[in-house]
Every structure is written in structure tokens, then in C-alpha cells.
Regions:
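Non-catalytic interaction-recognition regions
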Residues: 2-189, 196-679
């Protein structure tokens, strides 16, 4: 302790000496200004400027000295009326957000002229619960203004100005200028008990937005395949996350329901089922119908001409051709919906056909505005890069429209009719350049206004265990239905291997099979960074150890079983808490470690929504499960005697178990997994 006092004294003395020298220099400058000729304007201006800088530096140093002398004293009372400390029944408090605002108050009071430095408060495990890491940045900002203040002095000044808030138990300077923060366990307990009483609430959102999420997008008359898997799973999870945060989300399925392929399908339908207008044709196997029509289209020139003729008649909305088109679309929709029902996906269909009239209205406006250029018979549109890269092809040389045209019309519809504040496209990473150009063109012509956020959420390829593109043994694309069926079969084998059929009813076993099957497929995708390719392996995803859905689902069911073993229902636990007969236990270090992990739920969601990287939410879920295991191994919730009779129930710990289950259930829900109470 004596060494620390001596160090502070030495620093204070050095700072005092520098202050005296600065005072002398200021006085000398005053004299120079006084003695200079009135005509020497440039010199006078320079001297005044230097004088102002020295005065500023003097004031900073005085504050630093005062801070150094008072760093171990009690923090001053400061107004924190703007900090989010008041509990809101609609939101779960974010400790990181509160600390960021509290430290922001302290920084602005300590260094009011430094306003362009981010306030960094991050979770910490080694040196406290959180750590303030902006002192170095503030020191650098001061140095740029000609003021030299060491980061440690900056940190001390900030700590001295920290508002007194019930959240912060202790804040102390360490190392070269870090501030380690310990939060109040009582404050943390109050947040977690609110979760028990009111359910898991979202963090505070400063602005609720209307968000359009475009995902899945299969093609009519073709089966969904593994290539649609990532878009569907990622898009659904993003939608769930944004809905939980309070945004108004519109899920759009931009299906391919228009184009040349319908000409050949209709022509083949007419030949194969000539009575299709009066008798509904048995075309459940659209994939076979498509293959047959495609083969004829490629090999038979007369059939090809008929197909093109059918396209023209369809585009002219001739009733017989519209009915044939609707028949084909309806069959496809039913097949798509079977997959969506199994995976718990909700979507509003908005196909290519929806935008036909909008494209017809859009193209003349783009031409009239001078945004299109003629290129070898085509009409193209360049982005903001002045003719570099690849332009959008808005009109083909034959006068037809393209996917680029429909994408532009689609974007306009979402801004002007859906009134979207944020538009998200979930497609493979290979389309990144296309969307970059699309967004540039849309901004250039005024379709995409300032203030509307657009994101292309790209993802990598699904690989087989041979690290090549995922295919069947015969080299064909893997059908999504077949993949789901295989998942159910393998999950059943896994459950029977563990003899779960002996303890679960038939309905419970079926629910467990589907929970594991669809959960492991989704989680294996979401737990990987979406920007990377990932290897699809049932063997790995069905393992019950490590960061897998199986491990997490088992962990959840075990947590749910603890209260049941103690004979306590959720209603009884909430009553005990609300009536003051029990409180959530956070005294043991393992209890507090789990509690801190659960308290980070709001900040994890806030981080995920910034870059829509859902693997971070999966990592957090796995952290909860492993931290719970540490707690459960160290802290007895139920104590039994040698005969297995319950001797003691630690209600405070069971309350902590219940909060853990609630938070895990909410994360499962956002990820689209369906846990079951018994497995």
C-alpha cells in the first residue's frame, strides 16, 4: 500500500511541477503579446492560439491531479437521469448498455472536449464482471490536441466522476488504464427475478422498424433441395430475432413462378393431360413433369416453338393458360408448405408474377430518367462506380425482362408500398456482387432513399463429408424432403439406442424424434459462421457432446426436470418469489457465474442484430449450458439421503435453474428449435 501511495505522490508532484511551468509559459506569452507591435497580426494570432491551447492543457492537468489524489475516495454524486436504470416491464435491462451510458456520463464530465471517442465497456471474467477500455483512446485524442495525459490518469479521472448507481458495486483502475467493474449481485438478482415473474423480455430498442426479410425462394415445379436449406433456416431465425426485439417483420418468399419454363410445362401438360381444364390432372410429381418437358424442349424444335407460344399466351393472360399455370403453382405450393410445416417456417409468397406490371411501369421511367444505356441491343444500368464492374441488364435484346428487372421492381415495391425501413436478402454469397450493384442502382435512381437500410445476408455452400458440394451418391442434388426424412430416421435410432422408448410414451417419443432431427439440422447450420461453407454430417450433428443441438436439448430437459423432482411447479416457484418466501440464490461463485451469463442475454442479442451473425447466439446458448453444468456439479439443488429420499430442497437454486430454462427456451425459439420437456 505504501508503494502505491508513493507512486501517486510522485505522479502528483510531477504534474504540479508541470502546472507551474505552464503558468510561467502562459505569463511569458502574455508579455510577448503585450510588447508586440499592433501591426504584427499573424504573430499575435499565433500567440493567442498557443495561449488557448496551453490554458486547455493546464485545465486538463489540474483535473488529472485532482482525480489522482481522490481516486480512492468515494465517488461523487452525479445526475444520471438519462441512464436506463428504471425498470421497464416491457424490456430486460442490459447491464452493458447501462454501464456504457454511466461511463459515457463520466467521460463527458471529465473530458467535455473529447466527444468522438467510443465508450467501450466489455464483459470480463478475469478482472471483474466488466471492463472499461476507452482510456487509451481518450489519451490519444487528448494528445492530438496537444495535451499529454497518461491513460491511467484518464481512467482515474473517469472513475472519480462515475455516477453512484446501484448497479456498480466497485470500479477500480488497473494496469495501464483499464477500469475493472464489479456489479452488484443484488441488482443482478432483481433482473433475474423479473425474468421469473414476467418472462423473458427483449432488450430496449431505440426505434421499432418495419423490416422485410426475403428468404427461401424456391422455384415452382421444382423440388426444394439442400441449396434452399440455409436461406430458409437463416431467414426464419433472423425474422424471429427481429420480431422478438419488437420490429414489424414481413417474411417474403420470392418464388420463381414466371418465365420460359412455364411455357414448356404448359405445352407438356396439354399433351399429357388434354382434359386438364375439366379434370384435375395427377401431377403430384412435378419434378418428373419438369424433367420430361425440359427434355422435349431441348430435343424437339416444334415443341420448343409451342413452348414459346405458350409463354406469350400466358403473359397475355389468356384464361386457359392462366388456369394451367395456377394448377402447376398450386401443386408446388402444397409441397413447399409440407417442408415449411416440418421446419416451423412462416412465409408470405410474393412470386415473380407479382411484379410483372410493376416492371412494365418501371422500365419507361428509368429510360426517361436517363438511367439506362443501350448496349448491343440490351438496356443496361450501371451502379455508382461509373461504368466499372457488371451492370444490371434491365431489358434483353428481345425486349424481355430479366431477374435484374424484377429485383429492381421488387425493391421499389418494398420501399414504396411495404414502407420498409430495413430490407434483408438471405441468399448464397455468390450473389453478393449482384446485390451490391442492385443497391447502387436503386440509390442512383432514387428508388432506395436515404434512411432505408438494405443488407445482403450471404452464406457459404453446404458440403458433404468429402468436402465437396453436397450431393447424393449418384451425383444428384439432395432433396430437402429426403434429408428431413433421413434426419428423423437417424434421431429415432439415437433415441432407441438410449432406450428412451422405455420411459417415453409414443407421442413423447415422436416429439423427441422430430425435435432432435429438425433441431440438429438447423443448429448445425446456424452454429457455423454463415459466411463460411460447412460440412453436413449427421454423425457429428447427432453427437450428444460438444456444441450440438442434441447436447443442448438434453441439457434443457435435465434443467426442466429439477423442479419436477423437487415437486415444485412454476406457479409455486413464482408465488414463493413474489410473496417474499424465497429469493434467487447468487451467493456461491458458481451461482454468480451462471447468473452473470444469463444477465448477458440482452447484450448478446444487441450484438447479433448488428451483423446478423446467428452463430454468436449459438455460442451463447452453449455457454449457458456448460456454465449450468459447472453450477449443478458444485451446488446441490436437491439433497437426498442414501436411500434416495429428499432431505432438503434449495429453492433459491431451483429458481436459478428456472431462469436458466426460460432463457434457453427463448434462445431455442429464436433459432427455430423446439425443445421438449422430456427426452
Amino acid at each position: 500500500m505504501a508503494d502505491i501511495v508513493e507512486e501517486y505522490t510522485r505522479k502528483a508532484d510531477a504534474a504540479e511541477l508541470e502546472i507551474i511551468n505552464l503558468m510561467i509559459e502562459v505569463e511569458n506569452l502574455k508579455n510577448k503579446v503585450h510588447n508586440s507591435s499592433s501591426g504584427d497580426g499573424d504573430v499575435l494570432k499565433a500567440l493567442k492560439s498557443k495561449n488557448d491551447r496551453l490554458k486547455y492543457r493546464l485545465e486538463i492537468l489540474k483535473r488529472a491531479v485532482d482525480s489522482e489524489e481522490n481516486c480512492s475516495s468515494k465517488r461523487k454524486q452525479v445526475d444520471v437521469s438519462d441512464c436506463p436504470l428504471e425498470k421497464d416491464s416491457r424490456n430486460m435491462q442490459s447491464i452493458q448498455e447501462i454501464l456504457t451510458e454511466v461511463f459515457g456520463v463520466a467521460v463527458s464530465q471529465s473530458y467535455p472536449d473529447v466527444n468522438d471517442v467510443p465508450v467501450l465497456v466489455l464483459p470480463s471474467t478475469k478482472f471483474g464482471d466488466y471492463q472499461f477500455n476507452s482510456a487509451m483512446l481518450i489519451s490519444q485524442a487528448l494528445a492530438a490536441k496537444g495535451v499529454k495525459v497518461p491513460p491511467r490518469l484518464v481512467a482515474s479521472s473517469v472513475v472519480e466522476k462515475l455516477p453512484q448507481v446501484p448497479l456498480i458495486e466497485k470500479a477500480e483502475v488497473a494496469g495501464a488504464g483499464f477500469v475493472n467493474v464489479r456489479i452488484s449481485r443484488q441488482y443482478g438478482r432483481s433482473i433475474l427475478e423479473d425474468v421469473l415473474l414476467r418472462g423473458v423480455q427483449p432488450p430496449r430498442v431505440h426505434q421499432r422498424l418495419r423490416v422485410v426479410v426475403d428468404f427461401s425462394s424456391p422455384n415452382i415445379a421444382k423440388e426444394m433441395h439442400v441449396g434452399h436449406l440455409r436461406s430458409t433456416i437463416i431467414g426464419e431465425s433472423i425474422s424471429r430475432l427481429l420480431e422478438f426485439l419488437g420490429h414489424d417483420v414481413v417474411r417474403i418468399n420470392h418464388v420463381g413462378d414466371w418465365g420460359t419454363q412455364f411455357g414448356m410445362l404448359i405445352a407438356h401438360l396439354q399433351d399429357k393431360f388434354p382434359d386438364y381444364l375439366h379434370v384435375s390432372p395427377p401431377i403430384a410429381d412435378l419434378q418428373a413433369l419438369y424433367k420430361e418437358s425440359k427434355q422435349r424442349f431441348d430435343e424437339d424444335e416444334k415443341f420448343k416453338k409451342r413452348a414459346y407460344s405458350c409463354v406469350v399466351k400466358l403473359q397475355n393472360h389468356e384464361s386457359d393458360y392462366i388456369k394451367a399455370w395456377q394448377l402447376i403453382c398450386d401443386v408446388s405450393r402444397k409441397e413447399f408448405q409440407k417442408v415449411y410445416d416440418r421446419l416451423g417456417i412462416r412465409l408470405v409468397e410474393r412470386g415473380e408474377s407479382f411484379y410483372q406490371e410493376r416492371m412494365e411501369a418501371l422500365v419507361p421511367r428509368l429510360k426517361a430518367g436517363g438511367f439506362l444505356e443501350e448496349d448491343d441491343g440490351r438496356w443496361v444500368m450501371w451502379g455508382e462506380d461509373g461504368g466499372r464492374g457488371v451492370p444490371l441488364t434491365v431489358v434483353k435484346s428481345d425486349g424481355g425482362f430479366t431477374y435484374d428487372t424484377s429485383d429492381m421492381a421488387c425493391l421499389e415495391q418494398r420501399v414504396s408500398e411495404e414502407h420498409a425501413d430495413w430490407i434483408i436478402y438471405v441468399t448464397d454469397a455468390g450473389q453478393a456482387n449482384h446485390f451490391t450493384t442492385l443497391f447502387q442502382c436503386a440509390r442512383r435512381c432514387g428508388i432506395l432513399r436515404d434512411g432505408v437500410r438494405v443488407d445482403h445476408v450471404g452464406f457459404g455452400v453446404v458440403l458433404g463429408e468429402d468436402k465437396k458440394k453436397f450431393k447424393t451418391r449418384s451425383g444428384e442434388t439432395v432433396r430437402l424432403v429426403a434429408l428431413l426424412d433421413e434426419g428423423v430416421r437417424r434421431s429415432k435410432e439415437k433415441l432407441l439406442e438410449k432406450e428412451r422408448d422405455k420411459v417415453l410414451s409414443e407421442d413423447e417419443l415422436r416429439s423427441a424424434m422430430e425435435s432432435v432431427a429438425y433441431g440438429c439440422i438447423k443448429y448445425a447450420d446456424l452454429s457455423h459462421n454463415r459466411n463460411h461453407d460447412y460440412v453436413f454430417s449427421f454423425n457429428k450433428m447427432l453427437q450428444d457432446k460438444g456444441n450440438t443441438a442434441v447436447y443442448l436439448l438434453y441439457a434443457y430437459t435435465r434443467i426442466c426436470s429439477i423442479a419436477r423432482m423437487a415437486g415444485l411447479s412454476g406457479t409455486q416457484l413464482r408465488s414463493a418469489l413474489s410473496e417474499g418466501r424465497s429469493q434467487l440464490s447468487l451467493e456461491h461463485e458458481k451461482e454468480w457465474k451462471l447468473g452473470r451469463c444469463l444477465l448477458r442475454f440482452p447484450e448478446v442479442l444487441s450484438r447479433v442484430v448488428k451483423d446478423l451473425g446467428l452463430h454468436q447466439l449459438c455460442d451463447y446458448l452453449y455457454e449457458i449450458a456448460t456454465t449450468f453444468t459447472e453450477f449443478y456439479d458444485s451446488c446441490y439443488c436437491i439433497e437426498k439421503d442414501s436411500s434416495g429420499e429428499i432431505q432438503k430442497v434449495n429453492t433459491g437454486r431451483i429458481l436459478l435453474c428456472e431462469v436458466t430454462a426460460l432463457v434457453m427456451a427463448k434462445v431455442f425459439d429464436i433459432l427455430g428449435l423446439k425443445p421438449v420437456p422430456k427426452m
